[in-house]
Amino acid sequence: MNPIVINRLQRKLGYTFQHHELLQQALTHRSASSKHNERLEFLGDSILSYVIANALYHRFPRVDEGDMSRMRATLVRGNTLAEIAREFELGECLRLGPGELKSGGFRRESILADTVEALIGGVFLDSDIQTVEQLILNWYQTRLDEISPGDKQKDPKTRLQEYLQGRHLPLPSYLVVQVRGEAHDQEFTIHCQVSGLSEPVVGTGSSRRKAEQAAAEQALKMLELE
């Protein structure tokens, strides 16, 4: 891997790996090698959830479990992680197989989000829980400062449904129009039909649920509710 690109990435992350094979594995999609990042992603997902939950618990001592859960979901969802990945310019560092490269996998939100979680898992194994916790808090500082409890933290499908119900309009319909990839690494494309919008809204994700949420979020933006 290009050492200039990797050094720039580590500066953006705010962390330098002692064991570079962990960084290489974290950046490797399963389409590129049998030594890929899915186990690190599994580990990083759990660590991220703990760190964000702990931060919210101490920042909002009077907020109930439901609002804290919704805030955590907002902070750890795929499109938030993909935003962070783009801030790190992570796409140009990914190791992808030829098929994923050809189809633009370095731009795909699900791959970017999964890689951020894999990096978290890699940093943990390379250091300790205190180091990775502080690193995550650094990455999330602005988002943690800006987030607040309330209806805004409900998931997009719920907010879209409540908006339409409040205006006595039909509920949105979601239709799977395409499923790409093998069973272990699929991408779903959903069309969401919403009253008041002339064309179906498109959402993609690594599961049907995630694709529906992405479509609902896009619909909310088009309705100028975001």
Swiss-Prot record:
Q: Which GO terms describe its cellular component?
A: cytoplasm
Q: What is the predominant subcellular site recorded for this chain?
A: cytoplasm
Q: Write the record's keywords in alphabetical order, separated by commas.
A: Cytoplasm, Endonuclease, Hydrolase, Magnesium, Metal-binding, mRNA processing, Nuclease, RNA-binding, rRNA processing, rRNA-binding, tRNA processing
Localization: Cytoplasm
Gene Ontology MF terms: double-stranded RNA binding; metal ion binding; ribonuclease III activity; rRNA binding
Q: Which residue range or ranges hold the RNase III domain?
A: 6-128
What residue stretches are annotated with the DRBM domain?
Answer: 155-225
What the protein does comes down to: Digests double-stranded RNA. Involved in the processing of primary rRNA transcript to yield the immediate precursors to the large and small rRNAs (23S and 16S). Processes some mRNAs, and tRNAs when they are encoded in the rRNA operon. Processes pre-crRNA and tracrRNA of type II CRISPR loci if present in the organism.
| Family note | Belongs to the ribonuclease III family.
Subunit record text: Homodimer.
What is the protein name for this chain?
Answer: Ribonuclease 3
